[in-house]
Structure formats: C-alpha cells, structure tokens
Design a protein with these regions (language model features):
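Metal-dependent catalytic neighborhoods of phosphoester/phosphodiester hydrolases
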Residues: 18-26, 164-171
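Short internal beta-strands
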Residues: 32-39, 153-157
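Active-site neighborhood of divalent metal-dependent phosphoester bond hydrolases
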Residues: 29-31, 40-66
Length: 189
C-alpha cells in the first residue's frame, strides 16, 4: 500500500474543496500528513475548521497532521524539493519528486529556481488557454518554459475549454508534450 499525503500549493476553492474527500484514505491508513506554507495552512484551518480544530470531535472527520513547509522536506524517505513560483503576484509552490516536477496555477517561475529543474524525466505544468492571462501561463508561455527546462516529457494541466479540443491541440504540440487528462498515470524513475 502506498502512503497517502497531500501537498497544497494554494488555497483556491477549486483546489482544496476535495479535502473532505480524503476520508476513505484516513479510514484506511489513519492520520494524513498535509504539507503547505504557513499562509496555506492558516487558510485551510479557517475553511475546514472541523478538520483542523482538535477540540471538535465529529465522527468520521479525517485526522490531518499539518507540516509547515518553508524549504525542502522528506516524505516516505524521499526528498521533496520545494519550488518557488508566482500565481500573478501571489507566491506559491511547485514540487519536485525525484525526476518529476509539478506546477499548477503558475504565471512565473523565478530565474533562480530553474537550476532545481535540471534533468527532469517529467514536468507537469499548467497551460490555461491560448490567450494571455494575468495569473496563469498560456500555451506559449508553458511551451517556452518546457523548452528552457528540457524535460524528457511534459504534461499540460489546469487547461480550460479555451485551449481547444484535445485532439486538435495535441497534434500541434511538440512530440514530448502531452495534454494531461483525468485518470492519467505517469511513470518515471
């Protein structure tokens, strides 16, 4: 059995609304560690008080263990590298797990972070749409970052209907870049 954990990079409702859905994992494995910045943990505490407040005892409520991240951390004997990025003007995190890096809701990645992204097998990064957006990468921005990082494979996530139909967009992408989809499983070393 694989240990279940969560790393939160931001607190937008669409990204954290599923927190309550970790119940089945809690029933199976017990306490679930959550890794996030202090800002994100504070917001989660307010939004999901019944989960985080220890003096509230609601049967079936998942037990989470919060871990404030400011730097790299260890999970299940693996180093997780914290990657700084920006969602518009808001600082957020991406994460590198071995040879896979994951970003969502990114608009910019500071230049000093790129050295942490060398020799990737897989990069998962957002590409919201074709047109510019004030707080998300568009397709061209994402492709420029992919070209700079040079992962073996890249998957575009956090895409909207404004990007186009899957088949039409996919055939225009470089051969190592793929549109992600629900249920996708990615293997890497």
């Amino acid at each position: 059995p694989r240990p279940i954990s969560s790393a939160a990079s931001d607190v937008y409702k669409r990204q954290v609304s599923g927190l309550d859905d970790i119940r089945p994992f809690y029933f199976k494995q017990g306490s679930i560690p959550i890794y996030a910045s202090d800002r994100v943990v504070s917001a989660l505490n307010k939004r999901f008080e019944y989960v985080f407040k220890k003096d509230v005892n609601i049967p079936g409520t998942p037990n989470v263990i919060t871990n404030i991240i400011e730097d790299n951390f260890i999970f299940n004997r693996h180093e997780i590298i914290v990657l700084n990025a920006n969602h518009g003007n808001l600082p957020i995190h991406g994460f590198r797990f071995n040879n896979l890096a994951y970003f969502t809701d990114v608009k910019t990645i500071p230049q000093q972070e790129f050295y942490k992204l060398r020799d990737l097998d897989v990069l998962v990064i957002n590409a919201l749409r074709i047109e510019e957006h004030y707080s998300h990468l568009n397709l061209n921005d994402a492709l420029e970052i992919i070209s700079k990082i040079k992962p073996k494979r890249a998957y575009l996530t956090h895409i909207s209907h404004k990007l186009g139909f899957h088949e039409d967009v996919q055939k225009e992408l470089p051969e190592n870049v793929f549109l992600a989809y629900d249920g996708l499983q990615v293997e890497c070393d």
